[in-house]
A protein has these predicted regions:
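Alpha/beta-hydrolase fold catalytic core
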Residues: 1-38, 60-63, 101-102, 133, ...
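Conserved HGGG/HGGXW glycine-rich cap/lid loop of the alpha/beta-hydrolase fold
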Residues: 25-81, 238
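Catalytic active-site module of serine/aspartate enzymes centered on a nucleophile-bearing elbow/loop
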Residues: 254-284
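Gly/Ala-rich beta-loop-alpha elbow adjacent to hydrolase catalytic centers
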Residues: 108, 112, 116
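Conserved acidic catalytic loop of the alpha/beta-hydrolase fold
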Residues: 87-104
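Conserved alpha/beta-hydrolase catalytic His-Asp/Glu region
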Residues: 142, 146-151, 161-222
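Flexible "cap/lid" loop of the alpha/beta hydrolase fold
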Residues: 117-122, 126-165
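Short beta-strand/loop motif that positions the catalytic acidic residue
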Residues: 224, 230-232
């Protein structure tokens, strides 16, 4: 079921594999270190490679880190079909089951945070015992009745249209608002992130924008009973800080760690603080 793809010379510490979640769909994972599992779910339209500066920090502190690249992105297979949060949550469950993961900390960034909420609301506690929501696009990324926060749906409609006519421009526009200011991240980091984003399929990029636009997770929040940390940039232009406050109000056993100097990319803008907070939470 699993095919070894990379020989790092230290197989007991670093494993890069493909895991089959359906008969014709394999997802790429990075599985490194030993200890309590920390499972990382990337945001739109990135891959598990975005966590490069988290892997080493977590491994050094004695954690096993499992980065899952969602279908349609990065090195994972890119099938046509559904890309809703239920599909992604099921993929994650299948991977954690095959790896026999228990007592894990599930950390999701942006769209990955929204998917992590859906997963945690359905999980019986067999796999995950803590939840970290990082700049999460939740409980709703778009405005709706009784929820006047973040983007209007029409703005996402425009993003979907641009994806099909000029995807590089879509990603360039996205990069301009990814951090607190356009110069918060250096050119090298921005170029690296852009390369990861371009590795996604155009179809998955659009389908996940539809999921981001249409999914309302407000009813999921009350179902989450595990300890939850909400890490969010005060200057986030993609997922406004209002969303963090709404998640805090809806998840009973949760608290917010604000990142005063960060936009959406808090894991890169305040890397040391981010890693320290995640390690502290995972080690409790």
């Amino acid at each position: 079921m699993m095919e070894k793809q990379q020989d790092t010379g230290v197989p007991e510490l670093a494993r890069a594999e493909y895991i089959k979640v359906e008969s014709n769909v394999r997802l790429h994972i990075t599985d490194a270190g030993d200890g309590r599992p920390v499972v990382l779910i990337h945001g739109w339209p990135l891959s598990d490679e975005m966590f490069e500066y988290q892997y080493n920090a977590l491994i050094e502190k004695g954690f096993r880190v499992i980065g899952i690249t969602l279908r349609g992105f990065g090195k994972s297979d890119k099938p046509y079909g559904e890309y809703n949060y239920d599909i992604h949550a099921l993929d994650i469950r299948r991977i954690l089951s095959k790896l026999e993961i228990t007592d894990a900390v599930l950390a999701g960034f942006s769209m990955g945070g929204a998917i992590a909420i859906r997963f945690a609301s359905l999980d019986s506690g067999s796999h995950v015992s803590k939840l970290a929501l990082v700049g999460a696009a939740a409980p709703s990324w778009t405005q709706r009745k009784g929820f006047p926060y973040n983007l209007p749906k029409s703005a996402v409609d425009d993003l979907i249209k641009l994806n099909y006519t000029d995807r590089p421009k879509l990603l360039s526009n996205f990069a301009k608002i990814f951090s607190a200011t356009e110069t918060s991240l250096n050119d090298g980091i921005s170029s690296w992130l852009n390369g990861i984003c371009l590795s996604a399929s155009s179809y998955a990029t659009a389908q996940c924008l539809i999921a981001l636009r249409d999914t309302d997770l407000r009813s999921d929040l009350a179902k989450i009973q595990i300890p939850t940390v909400i890490m969010h940039g005060n200057k986030d232009k993609i997922c406004s800080f209002d969303l963090a406050e709404q998640m805090k109000a809806g998840i009973s056993n949760s608290y917010i760690v604000p990142f005063e100097n960060s936009g959406h990319s808090l894991f890169l803008e305040e890397t040391q603080k981010f890693n320290a907070e995640l390690i502290k939470f995972a080690g409790k």
